[in-house]
Amino acid sequence: MKKKVMLGVIAAMVVSMSATVFAGPSIGQIIPEEPQIVSTNVPEGAKLVVSTIDVTDEKTLDNYTSNETVKTLLKTVNDEETKPTIETVKEVLKEMNVEDVTNVETKSGEKVDLTEYKFTTPFIDIAEQIGDQITYKTNGDLEVKVKIDAAKEKKAEDLLLMLVDPETGKVVFITIDEIDPVTGELKVTLPFLGAMTILDKSAEAA
């Protein structure tokens, strides 16, 4: 764990309570919702902090991550003036050990073609905080329920959660455990915390 300057608008929560997560139907439109932590394998006194990731200021971004590849990915996806695609970040993903975007293994072992998916939310940051210490490591997998507006009227099989460790640059693609298409509530299992975004392969993807 180490001290970090948290970015953007920060919301904090005790793990047994709820917090504000930012997500939205399109890049640049971020809508707060309230997630729930399902898992109980969290340290006493821990909080989750959730924030937007400001990619417009180099010093702020440097405080978030020293990994140049992660910086490039975040800048590309969180650019409000463009519509990033998997194709535009393909070379960056190669540097993150995603060699073939058409044949990627998810955390659960499924094979997916990322080129079928579109980014529907910018990257946001989720971290664990104890006092003034921040960590992206978890004590095993962490089950989370979170409402995301972009997930409304969607099917679980059409969505992927992309999660990036800002410290190591590790990237994982996570299938959705459960979904409520009416509220947009997703249940997902996270192996660590960090920068996350939602990918959608349905025809209605933004």
Task: State what each model feature region is.
Residues M1-A23:
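Gram-negative bacterial Sec-dependent N-terminal signal peptides
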Residues Y136-A205:
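Proteolytic-maturation and junctional protease-sensitive modules
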Residues S26-Q36, S108-L160:
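Proteolytic processing hotspots in large secreted/extracellular or virion-associated proteins
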Residues P25-L48, I53:
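N-terminal segment immediately downstream of the Sec signal-peptide cleavage site
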Residues I53-K137:
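Self-processing/autoproteolytic domain segments and adjacent N-terminal interaction modules in large
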Residues V15-P32, A205-A206:
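Sec-dependent signal peptide cleavage junction
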Residues S16, N41-P43, K137:
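A generic structural signal for short, non-catalytic loop/turn and secondary-structure boundary residues
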Residues V5, T20-V21, F123, T138-D141, ...:
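Solvent-exposed loop/turn and edge beta-strand elements of beta-rich ligand-binding domains
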